[in-house]
């Protein structure tokens, strides 16, 4: 059943599909306003009615794509299975045929276009749906526009301009280039992710906030008018043990729930992770990963044990730890046994320098269970294995990576031999970085890292977020944080 705006979207999309003048449809909506639900229902009907032949569902990240794919597939019935062959899921990188390339100058992994996209070159009667468009960088938008200008492409952009933009950009180019009074631009403004009237009201207050006004009283009004107490306001005290937010948070942990505290600064998240871990473990000695810790993945990770995938922001709980000491890689294997040229000798000199660096670390082999994921079911009891550099060795590990990186960069600047240096960078990534999960403790993260995720219970450090001097960015961060909650939302204020 569609609401009024969703039905308008259905009518306008049908009109959009049946015309050839305009190539872009903007479906803009509040966080949790039902954009994906609306598009999935409408485009499914387009396929059934043979108005289109195929749909490419795309997103900027693997995590966002998996969330999208999981939702779309859950709405395909057994009788609709023949439609599955007409629905493709891919990242925008794949759509554009971007491939990961290691830059020989710096060793950084970047995505670059390697050839013309076969998906967009032969796109007649195919539709492209791009979700989370607030996260699309200017480079990606420029590349998409090249194809839009060349081929009969029709794209639906879905997103929310009040969400945080790509890192380093003031606003996503998608939103800043929407023409005035454009006929294929619809805003969904009723929040559907949560059934909580309170959370919807808070998101609305933040979204419509005039930054010259004080917001506290408007939030207090929402709190005072609440009948469900899904929205709470807490005062931050110097003695956190006496704070009602802290007692509430710990109670949820003890009930095996997965609450999260959202902040602006990484240092503030570190503070919350530390005080919560000290309470849970009843110890000041928390310099390592411990049983019952909640962990969150900072990046995609494939376990070397069984290639099990974990996505950015997936959360796990440690149930067992084992520690081994290991030399990460024996660099002497790369020595040229019979150097014949000056280049060979200089290369061997580089390898010897790298070999002298401390390359022995303690590795935690952690048995974990999933407790939160927007991609994979976290209700199962399966035990997974992940490898991490021991917490107490992390600084030394990062220093080693930095030193090796500098040595390889220096060698490249001097000799400019791409083949040799590319091989070294490959070892650097596959032997030293990729086998080990990049994780953080999972009780608190920044609002930026939370984008695209949904949590049952969210606590927001309003004081920390409002310390951002960029008021527009601050508003988007606060709005993003509030929109992560599905059942309970708490604002922590002075």
From Swiss-Prot:
It holds the Pfam family AAA_19. This is Uncharacterized protein R530. InterPro entries: Coronavir_polyprotein_1ab, P-loop_NTPase, UvrD-like_helicase_C. It comes from the Viruses. SUPFAM superfamilies: P-loop containing nucleoside triphosphate hydrolases (SSF52540).
């Amino acid at each position: 059943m569609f609401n009024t705006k969703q039905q308008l979207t259905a009518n306008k999309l049908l009109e959009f599909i049946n015309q050839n003048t305009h190539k872009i449809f903007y479906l803009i909506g509040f966080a949790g306003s039902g954009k994906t639900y609306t598009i999935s229902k409408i485009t499914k009907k387009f396929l059934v009615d043979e108005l289109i032949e195929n749909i490419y569902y795309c997103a900027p990240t693997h995590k966002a794509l998996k969330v999208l794919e999981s939702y779309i597939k859950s709405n395909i019935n057994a009788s609709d299975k023949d439609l599955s062959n007409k629905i493709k899921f891919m990242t925008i990188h794949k759509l554009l045929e971007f491939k990961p390339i290691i830059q020989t100058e710096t060793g950084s992994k970047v995505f670059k276009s390697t050839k013309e996209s076969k998906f967009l070159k032969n796109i007649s009667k195919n539709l492209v749906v791009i979700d989370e468009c607030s996260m699309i960088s200017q480079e990606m938008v420029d590349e998409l526009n090249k194809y839009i200008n060349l081929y009969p492409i029709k794209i639906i952009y879905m997103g929310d301009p009040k969400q945080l933009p790509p890192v380093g950009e003031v606003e996503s180019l998608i939103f800043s280039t929407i023409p005035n009074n454009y006929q294929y631009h619809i805003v969904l403004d009723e929040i559907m992710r949560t059934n909580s009237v309170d959370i919807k009201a808070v998101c609305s207050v933040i979204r419509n906030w005039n930054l010259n006004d004080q917001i506290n009283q408007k939030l207090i009004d929402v709190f005072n008018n609440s009948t469900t107490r899904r929205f709470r306001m807490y005062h931050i005290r110097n003695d956190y043990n006496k704070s009602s937010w802290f007692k509430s948070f710990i109670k949820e942990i003890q009930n095996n729930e997965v609450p999260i505290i959202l902040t602006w600064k990484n240092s503030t998240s570190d503070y919350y992770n530390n005080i919560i871990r000290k309470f849970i473990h009843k110890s000041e000695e928390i310099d390592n990963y411990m049983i019952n810790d909640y962990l969150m993945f900072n990046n995609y990770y494939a376990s070397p044990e069984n290639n099990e995938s974990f996505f950015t922001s997936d959360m796990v709980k440690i149930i067992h730890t084992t520690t081994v000491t290991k030399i990460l890689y024996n660099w002497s294997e790369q020595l040229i046994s019979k150097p014949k040229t000056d280049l060979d000798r200089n290369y061997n000199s580089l390898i010897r320098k790298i070999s002298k660096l401390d390359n022995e670390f303690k590795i935690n082999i952690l048995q974990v269970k999933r407790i939160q994921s927007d991609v994979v079911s976290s209700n199962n009891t399966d035990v997974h294995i992940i490898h991490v550099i021991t917490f107490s060795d992390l600084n030394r590990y990062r220093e080693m990576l930095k030193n090796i990186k500098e040595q390889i960069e220096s060698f490249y600047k001097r000799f400019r031999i791409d083949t040799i240096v590319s091989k070294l960078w490959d070892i650097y990534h596959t032997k030293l970085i990729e086998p080990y999960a990049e994780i953080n403790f999972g009780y608190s993260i920044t609002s930026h890292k939370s984008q695209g995720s949904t949590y049952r219970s969210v606590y927001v450090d309003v004081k920390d977020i409002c310390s951002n001097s960029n008021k527009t960015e601050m508003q988007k961060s606060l709005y993003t944080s509030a929109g992560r909650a599905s059942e309970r939302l708490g604002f922590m204020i002075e």
